[in-house]
Regions:
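Conserved beta-strand-loop-alpha-helix junction that forms the acyl-donor binding cleft
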Residues: 142-152
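Glycine-rich acyl-CoA binding loop
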Residues: 121
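Conserved active-site tyrosine of GNAT-family acetyltransferases
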Residues: 154-155, 182
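Flexible ATP-lid and adjacent glycine-rich G1/G2 motifs of the Bergerat
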Residues: 128
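GNAT-family acyltransferases
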Residues: 1-118, 131, 135, 175-180, ...
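Conserved catalytic-core motifs of GNAT/GCN5-like acyltransferases
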Residues: 161-175
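Conserved GNAT acetyl-CoA-binding A-motif
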Residues: 133-144
Length: 223
């Protein structure tokens, strides 16, 4: 779509609760979520390998990091609440938010081991995408270190299209970062949304919790 004469820029995403079946995204609150998040990541230093920050050494350091996120008005940070036990087990941001162009990104996705590879983890991405497109955004971005193979596979599984590689894009923790770019645009979202919803349906899982149809196959991707 090239003619945008009637298009209006969406608002900056308000910090609000996003409710799902398996998870709930709550605006990050250090007092409310800090202790649970720090506990969930205890001993999980490898999670931070490709993130721009180093793994916090203790609860106080973790809460200071979370506080810096809350105070950053350029992002929309969420705690990921696992509704199985109503505990915060991760966090992510809406970031690189450019209302004038209708662009937003989900990033700094930080899932603790108990949250990884769960329906709640997948639903969190669905909720962020549905929120942004529901506000009127046109483009949903995913970017990652090109060395981060799990993140690249996840992007394809979720239905993001690979767009290319920004070589020597950043210096992170004293190392070169080539950045892989992925996106979903508004015209693609209805099909991606339907795939997410079909995969997340309880009918897609057997009595042992095993998926019947993969999200990758629903999106036509091989993760």
């Amino acid at each position: 779509m090239s003619d945008l004469a009637d298009w209006k820029a969406p608002p900056f995403p308000p910090r609000k609760v996003l409710e799902g079946h398996y998870c709930r995204l709550e605006p990050l609150d250090v007092a409310k979520h800090g202790a649970e998040i720090a506990a969930a990541f205890a001993g999980a230093g490898s999670v931070w390998t490709y993130l721009p920050a180093y793994a916090p050494k203790d609860r106080a350091e973790y809460e200071a990091l979370l506080d810096s996120m809350v105070k950053n008005k350029d992002i929309c940070p969420f705690a990921v609440i696992d509704k199985a036990d109503n505990k915060a087990k991760g966090h992510l941001w809406l970031m690189e938010i450019r209302p004038a162009h209708g662009v937003f990104e989900v990033g700094f996705i930080t899932y603790s081991p108990p949250l990884q590879r769960t329906r709640a983890a997948t639903e969190a991405i669905y909720l962020t995408g549905d929120y942004g497109f529901g506000l009127g955004y046109r483009r949903f971005e995913w970017k990652c270190n090109n060395r981060n193979e799990p993140s690249k596979r996840a992007a394809l599984r979720y239905g993001f299209k690979h767009e290319g590689l920004f070589r020597q894009h950043q210096v992170v923790k004293g190392e070169n970062r080539d950045t892989a770019w992925y996106s979903i645009i508004d015209s693609e979202w209805p099909a991606r949304k339907a795939a997410f919803e079909r995969w997340l349906s309880s009918e897609n899982f057997d009595a042992q919790g095993r998926q019947k149809v993969s999200l990758s196959s629903l999106n036509g991707n091989v993760a």
